[in-house]
């Protein structure tokens, strides 16, 4: 009787975990966006269209990428969010800003470049891989805390990113 009670308790625990896992997976798949928002954004451009999705993803994760919020999105959702973060950071401050804002690992330590290639953005994927080489070789220095002056000096120190940023803007 004691053994069967223990087995029943274990099964209940695993059933609860399984239900929680399935619920989590279903919730991931059920992120919804308003059709009217998509239609409006489609008329404004591709960046705005993507933004409709990524804004919803940010809402789901509470605006923060943490170990606790990462599982709330699928790999595809993370890839689209990573693209939007990449685009915004490069457009407003380049690779140095992207890395200093804490997104280096999110972009370069995950299969982001591979997914971009699989989605058909082959030249963009190559660009991300080239930036990853610079990032990997200089990660410790690129990620260290800096004053505003030290941050601005990074743009001279890491001119290797300049050509990649220009290539991205030309895509």
Show where each model-derived region lies.
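N-terminal amphipathic/basic-hydrophobic helices that include classical n-h-c signal peptides
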Residues: 1-29
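Extended, alpha-helix-rich binding/interface surfaces that flank or overlap catalytic cores
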Residues: 27-92, 96, 100-108, 115-171
């Amino acid at each position: 009787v004691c053994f069967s009670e223990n087995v029943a308790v274990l099964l209940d625990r695993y059933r609860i975990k399984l239900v929680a896992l399935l619920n989590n997976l279903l919730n991931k798949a059920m992120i919804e966006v308003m059709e009217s928002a998509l239609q409006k954004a489609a008329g404004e451009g591709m960046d705005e269209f993507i933004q409709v999705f990524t804004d919803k993803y940010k809402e789901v994760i509470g605006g923060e990428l943490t170990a606790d919020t990462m599982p709330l999105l699928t790999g595809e959702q993370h890839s689209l969010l990573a693209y939007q973060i990449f685009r915004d950071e490069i457009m407003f401050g380049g690779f140095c800003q992207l890395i200093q804002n804490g997104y280096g690992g999110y972009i370069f330590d995950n299969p982001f470049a591979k997914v971009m290639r699989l989605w058909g953005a082959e030249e963009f994927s190559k660009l991300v891989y080239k930036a990853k080489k610079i990032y990997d070789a200089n990660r410790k220095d690129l990620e260290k805390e800096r004053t505003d002056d030290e941050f601005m000096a990074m743009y001279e120190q890491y001119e290797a990113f300049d050509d990649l940023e220009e290539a991205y803007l030309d895509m």
